[in-house]
A protein has these predicted regions:
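ASCE RecA-like P-loop NTPase motor cores
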Residues: 1-250
Length: 250
């Protein structure tokens, strides 16, 4: 049996361990091959060291301001990847009208039709803004100029009190493991890599990825998310003002 995927591994040391355990084949032979894309030339990554953590009261206001700023910076052509429909609603309540004024259509998952319809309209527009959740973090392919800006609003951790997540945590603990390090974090890393991977789908694609969750800089586990990015990709801080220069990339 041969299993292949661009995101079987977490992108960190021991990256296949999580997938191997989940599939019941911890001793499987693994190999990680390089990408044909030149990520360091095709994309830039921006983080925001000043962004409040998601638990802070000012987070949504700052998040909304940053999303609007980034969408305006590239004139649309943006995926705004959220982790829940609640966050989508909160963003649209705050900046929905301003996003509509950027130029292209604003397509919102859960409001404007099924994911397949939103994706078709986004591709056709060329300057649209698609605000979505789980369906758009993986398995969608938009090549060319239509998608030049991927905004990750929050690290994609599972909600810990969901019954399935609680059951997985109990199983990990029963086996002597650590629910966060052995399950929640690897799952989030893979989903994060999938989200980042929406941007570069061919050797001709270019653009930016913005990570609007300061935990990648402030938390000990945050380094693993940065390590999961494509090797050699330049990373800059939005707080430094460097995001104003995206010439040739967006």
């Amino acid at each position: 049996v041969i299993m292949t995927s661009a995101t079987l591994a977490t992108g960190t040391v021991g990256g296949f361990d999580h997938a191997s355990r989940r599939m019941g084949c911890p001793d499987a032979e693994t190999i990680q091959l390089g990408s044909p894309f030149h990520f360091s030339d095709q994309m830039k990554v921006f983080v925001d060291s000043t962004m409040p953590e998601p638990s802070e009261a000012s987070y949504l206001t700052r998040l909304s301001d940053r999303v609007l700023e980034l969408v305006r910076m590239t004139g649309g052509g943006a995926f705004v990847l959220c982790t829940s429909f609640k966050i989508i609603e909160q963003l649209m309540d705050r900046i929905g009208e301003q996003l509509a004024g950027v130029g292209g259509p604003v397509l919102v998952q859960g409001r404007d039709g099924p994911p397949s319809k939103l994706l078709e309209e986004f591709r056709a527009a060329g300057d649209g803004v698609l605000v979505g959740t789980a369906s758009f973090w993986h398995g969608v392919d938009v090549r060319g100029y239509a998608l030049r800006n991927v905004i990750i609003t929050r690290l994609p951790f599972d909600v810990p009190d969901r019954p399935l997540v609680e059951a997985r945590s109990e199983r990990v603990k029963a086996g002597g493991g650590h629910p966060f390090m052995d399950d929640a974090l690897p799952r989030s890393l893979i989903r994060f890599r999938q989200g980042v991977g929406r941007l570069i789908r061919s050797s001709h694609d270019e653009g930016i990825v913005a990570i609007l969750d300061s935990r990648v800089l402030r938390k000990p586990y945050g380094r693993q998310f940065l390590a999961a990015l494509p090797e050699g990709v330049p990373i800059s801080d939005l707080a430094s003002g460097e995001a104003s220069d995206v010439s040739g990339l967006a």
